[in-house]
């Protein structure tokens, strides 16, 4: 399985409609902990996974020094015909941070400023690469163990601006942008 052992898939981090994410160790990266997104093995999911891979490569290429806060793709491989994407492993998503550390009080203003600046850097990179994420929400924003570093993840719904058509179903219902309702271009 290309430097991964099934015994090394040691923790399920999440399950979704399109994929499962597990924590593992990557022998190719010095036994470093990684998160592996295992795309479901059917034609539609495989095609979507390949599109996500293309977008992640574009973002990585545009940010070789990893300064723009988009989750880093280390590599990809196939396991039992499943496309697998190996990423840097971060601690928890923003929803979990808010629930654990900000329940009933929110998080402090300095953290909000820092997170906002980092998220804006990710948006700046996506704009430079002509990419629309289309699913920005707390679940798709990861935070490191010390809660100082934030990265945007899950580019499974992302597309190039030139390929995009505004529809009411472009993003998750509760996080839908105003332009979706007004049918206004989101790139100006």
Predicted feature descriptions by range:
Residues 142-172:
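Activation segment/activation loop of eukaryotic-type protein kinase catalytic domains
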Residues 10-16, 21:
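Protein kinase glycine-rich loop
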Residues 75-76:
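A short, aromatic-enriched beta-strand patch in the conserved N-lobe beta-sheet
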Residues 68, 80-84, 89-147:
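Conserved alphaE helix
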Residues 38-67:
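Conserved N-lobe beta3->alphaC-helix segment of eukaryotic protein kinase catalytic domains
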Residues 20-40:
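Glycine-rich ATP phosphate-binding loop
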């Amino acid at each position: 399985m290309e430097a991964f052992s099934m015994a090394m898939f040691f923790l399920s981090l999440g399950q979704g409609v399109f994929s499962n994410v597990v924590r593992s160790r990557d022998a190719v990266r010095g036994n470093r902990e990684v998160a592996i997104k295992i795309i479901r093995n059917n034609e539609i999911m495989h095609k979507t996974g390949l599109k996500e891979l293309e977008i992640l490569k574009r973002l990585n290429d545009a940010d070789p020094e990893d300064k723009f806060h988009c989750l880093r793709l280390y590599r990809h491989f196939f396991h039992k015909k499943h496309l697998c994407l190996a990423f840097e492993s971060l601690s928890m998503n923003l929803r979990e941070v808010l629930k654990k550390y900000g329940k009933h009080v929110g998080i402090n203003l300095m953290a909000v400023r820092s997170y906002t600046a980092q998220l804006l850097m990710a948006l700046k990179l996506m704009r430079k690469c002509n990419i629309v994420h289309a699913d920005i929400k707390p679940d798709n924003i990861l935070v490191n163990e010390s809660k100082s570093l934030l990265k945007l993840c899950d580019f499974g719904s992302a597309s190039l601006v030139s390929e995009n058509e505004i529809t009411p179903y472009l993003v998750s219902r509760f996080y839908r942008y105003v332009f979706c309702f007004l049918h206004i271009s989101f790139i100006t």
